């Protein structure tokens, strides 16, 4: 009786140093596909294996040359300081205390009086920009004694949060931090589409392109010791910039406030009831991501690969 070959619906990961093991498991398990993943590289020896090739494609990172050459289009997010009680008529708040300096860098390039927000948490009201100032990594506030204050500010994600999460969790060493760039901004959008077409042309053996981190960032915040400070795998809150927020304002017809994302320091986690403004923001982000996803989906299908 002829042997019936049973293969399919199993995908196995691989790396440069496990080629023989990959082929062995491919045969034993009857897998029909091989893939790489974050932190691994696809071995060229396997491109002619009797299996489909799935290739991970990073739409927002793994191109530090571009990110370093275009720092104005590095991805950004909002972050809030801790609560600081005013001991007198002023209080000075350090912005990066409790935040990993490897992960974030304060954005002082854009108008801080427009895009930052100092909050009197005792009254729940914003402090007018003329009553606070920034210098040397801290904000000094003209305060009401014994009131609590926070600062919400924009920061560049100088280490991709997912890459940092994977590196920290797996204990990686001797690697370059991948900088995350904003595919929705003009220069990077144009470059990213050219980059994708080039990847497809140079990898004709790839059957399926596995997109990861699809133009938006999860909110992953680490402290100075690389411990998780806040993690939200579901939202779009770490995908902001003045460029994007100006578009949001034009669509919804009202002025954006950092507090819509910060939410008193809760960051609109899944246990919070979202405000109308945050729901508007989520809907806007979702439509923008879907529009760009459609554009990136079209390129590989035209070239014969599957996204």
Model-derived segments and spans:
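Glycan-processing catalytic domains of CAZymes
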Residues: 1-307
């Amino acid at each position: 009786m002829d042997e019936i070959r049973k293969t399919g619906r199993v995908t196995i990961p691989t790396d440069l140093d496990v080629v023989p093991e990959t082929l062995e498991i491919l045969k034993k398990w009857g897998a029909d596909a091989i893939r790489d993943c974050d932190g691994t590289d696809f071995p060229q020896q396997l491109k002619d294996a009797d299996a489909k090739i799935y290739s991970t494609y990073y739409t927002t990172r793994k191109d530090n040359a571009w990110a370093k050459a275009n720092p104005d289009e590095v991805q950004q997010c909002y972050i809030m300081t801790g609560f600081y009680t005013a001991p007198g008529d002023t209080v000075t708040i350090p912005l990066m205390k409790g935040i990993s300096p490897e992960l974030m860098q304060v954005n002082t390039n854009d108008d801080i009086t427009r895009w930052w927000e100092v909050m009197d948490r005792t009254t729940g009201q914003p402090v007018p920009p003329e009553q606070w100032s920034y210098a040397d990594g801290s904000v000094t506030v003209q305060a009401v004694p014994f009131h609590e204050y926070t600062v919400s500010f924009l920061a560049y994600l100088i280490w991709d949060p997912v890459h940092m999460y994977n590196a920290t969790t797996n204990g990686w060493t001797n690697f370059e931090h991948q900088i995350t760039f904003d595919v929705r901004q003009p220069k990077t959008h144009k470059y990213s589409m050219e980059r994708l077409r080039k990847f497809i042309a140079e990898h004709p053996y790839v059957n399926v392109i596995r997109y990861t981190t699809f133009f938006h960032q999860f909110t992953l915040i680490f402290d100075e010791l690389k411990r998780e400070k806040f993690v939200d795998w579901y939202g779009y809150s770490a995908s902001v910039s003045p460029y994007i927020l100006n578009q949001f304002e034009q669509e919804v017809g009202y002025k954006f406030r950092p507090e819509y994302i910060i939410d008193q320091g809760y960051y609109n986690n899944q246990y919070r009831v979202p405000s109308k403004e945050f729901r508007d923001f989520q809907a806007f982000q979702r439509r923008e991501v879907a529009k760009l996803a459609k554009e990136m989906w079209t390129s590989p299908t035209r070239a014969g690969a599957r996204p």
